[in-house]
Structures are given as C-alpha cells and as structure tokens.
Amino acid sequence: MNLLNTVSNYLPAGLIQETARQTGESESSISNVIKAAIPTVLAGLISKSSTDSNGIFSLVQSASNANILGKLSSIIDVNQSSNAGSFNIWTILQHLFGDKLQGLIRSLSAFAGVKESSAQTALGLSAATTLGAVGTHAAANNLDANGLSSYLQSQKAELSAAVPAGFDFAAMAGTLGLGSLFAANPVVERTNINTP
C-alpha cells in the first residue's frame, strides 16, 4: 500500500480550497506546500519510529482515537487555535522536529511562494492528515508498535520517489536530522502525490 497516496486521499479538494481561502493563497500554492509537507512529516515518523517505535505508535494512536480525520477543518481555521479537541498537532510536530520546525516552515514557504503563516497552516493540515491516516491503517490492520515501525520503514522507497520537483528534500532531511534516512534510497524528485 502506498501510504503517500492514502494520506492524500483524505485531503478532499474542498479542504484545500478552504485552506487557500482562509490563508489568502492560491489553491495551487497550498497544494504545493502539502505535496512537500506530507513526505517530510512521513520522513519524521519513519526516522523516529526506528528509535522510538512505542512513542510513534502512541502518537498515531492518539490521532486515530481523537478522530482527527473528521476534524481537519478545525486545523485550518485561522480564528481558532491549531488544535482539534485534545489533539494538538503542534505539540506533535515539535516532538518530531524539535527546534528545526520553524526552519521547515520557512523552507515550505519559500518553496511554494506563500506566507510563512500559510505554510504553517498547510503543514498542520498535512501533519494531522498524515498521523490520522497512519493511525487508521494501524488500527485497521491490528498493528502493534513493532508492526507499525516495520510498515513505516517499508515506505522509504515510495517516499524517496514522491518529493515534488524543486523542493530540496535531501538538504531539508539533513537540516532536520533525517539525512541518514535515505542513505540507501537516493531521492528522485517528481510530482506523483495525488493531491486534487
């Protein structure tokens, strides 16, 4: 199963349109942020799962239990906190990327030509969708922490092939401390994530 496309399928065109409206950006620009953000968030999950499988399992399980996929619209409401019930995506992103998170937001902003605040909103939406999709997959397939870690590791090749053209993922992975993640899987840039 291609996890990247599974995640993208949870992002309907209407939600991308609403994100563009809320942020004042074009739909194509928001879509570009999402195309770069999803592989980056997955890279963070893959990297962390190799050293903290129980922690990552707990994160995606909490996303699934909070029904985050049914609350994505709350992530993009700029008039509310970036929080969906008790599930705070920014706490999780801080856990994944630490003090490199703001640098990631700046890189996404520069790549898509959008405001940093817009890139942050689209990243939050992408991350919430990613964790929700992974959590749903784990629950549907009765995966435990080790099973989920193995599944995430199996997605490396797909991840390497899904980076949008123009986004320097190799450099970003190094900046985020994920450089060794693709040591055996050279990054090939192409736009094959099926965002609407």
Please describe what each predicted stretch is.
Residues 1-196:
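A structural "flexibility-hinge" signal
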